[in-house]
Amino acid sequence: MAEFKYDIVKTFGTVSENDNGWVKEVNLVSWNEREPVYDIRVWQENHEKLGKGITLTEVELKNLKNLLNTMDI
C-alpha cells in the first residue's frame, strides 16, 4: 500500500460522532504536500487514522452549497 502524507490546514467543524469516538469532519487538507482541498471524512479523534471521505475543490464546494440551498430540508 502506498504511503501518503496529509496536513489538516484548517478544521471547520464536526458533522457527527459515532459511539466509537470517530468523527465526521469538514476540513481543509493538503494531501501529499499538494494544494489544500476541502475534505469531508471520518477521522479517529486524534487524526491518526482516517476512513472514507470525499475531497472537493473550492468550485465543487460552492456548487454543493448551492445545491444544498435548493433542497427543502
What are these regions (language model features)?
Residues 1-73:
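Positively charged, low-complexity terminal tracts
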